[in-house]
Amino acid sequence: MTIIDGHHQLILPGLIEKHCHFDKSKLGVPWYPVTPAKSIVERVETEIPYLDSLELSLTERANHLIDLELPHGATAFRTHVDVEPMTDLRYFDEVQALAQTKPFAVEIVVFPQHGLLRSDSVELVDQALAKGADFIGGVDPYSLDGDYKKSLAETFRLADKHGVGVDIHLHDRHEAGTTTIKEIIRLTKEYGLQDKVFISHAFGLNDFIGEERDEVYDALAAEKIHINSSVPITPNTIPPIMELLRHGVNVHLGCDNIYDCWSPYGDGSLQEKLARLGELFNVKDQDALTQLLGLVTDGVTTLDEQGQANWPQVGAEATYLLTEAECAAAFVARQTPVEISVVKGTTLYQK
């Protein structure tokens, strides 16, 4: 048995990166800015040829991304991976092989970024799911595929066929966003996929008003549909996270774009995302900051909402981090550096 001397540091649960893209990283190659694109379609159609031309392999670039996140406490990852005719299964196979070499958990989302229907990717997605992916993804089925009901029906059919979860990028606003969200709720209930469906970004949650707003948020909670956010700072874009939490909706954070074809920014810090969220929503007091940690730990917090000890407990998995922070609230607000992270008893990172 290995004994780690904590030197009177604070122990916290390991952080979970809930939304990233291993295959899109440009980390490790010379600086190249984001080129202008007139639409999401233009962006996705120029991205793959560019990534294929880079001097570093997907595996090398993904490792740079992982190495960027580990010092900030990440101990598990969920990555979306492009699967469509331009990539075939190349990216998926490489990410899956990489994941199998890591001591930490890597969940893989099959991501038909060019549109499940628009790019005729149903068969390829089916093949990737058969090879062991954890989730089926998608993006804006209303605006990109042009038939959100058919697109979502295929998505949930494949999820049911392979016994996997769903994690869909949803940037659409107003009617496009709200109708898509309501259809996801309906299909989650129909297929019995409670606790296995995630909506990433979910900007359209801002567009529900009045009684319908409460009804939809309550339905998300009832069907145990999770929301993933990268905490955008564009006005009126980030979902109303604190309101969702009050309704009992599970919310998680992820870094998303980190120096790729979509954004030149991103430092790989889940701590920064958490602190930014706290500032945006004016979270200041001890109890609220303590609970905020749960957004990057799958809901695990050191204290429960009544202030009682909640973690660690005897028998809990030995996945944790050590920090000089005085308490969880200080770790969240002050972004106190991580000194050591451990996954299942094995040291993953040491400062």
Model-derived regions: residue spans:
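Histidine-rich, glycine-flanked metal-binding segment
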Residues: M1-L12
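Alpha-helical scaffold segments that flank or form the walls of functional sites
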Residues: I11, G28-H80, M86-T101, L124-A130
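Histidine-centered catalytic micro-motifs
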Residues: P13-S25, V81, G165-H174
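Active-site gating loops and adjacent loop-to-helix segments of metal-dependent hydrolytic enzymes
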Residues: S25-L58, T180-F198, V216, C255, ...
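Active-site mouth loops of central-metabolism enzymes
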Residues: V44-E60, E107-D120, D140-D145
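Active-site core of metal-dependent hydrolases
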Residues: V110-R118, A130-I238, Y259
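His/Asp/Glu-enriched, well-ordered alpha-helical/loop segment
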Residues: E190-V197, M242-T323
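C-terminal cap of metal-dependent C-N hydrolases
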Residues: W311-K351
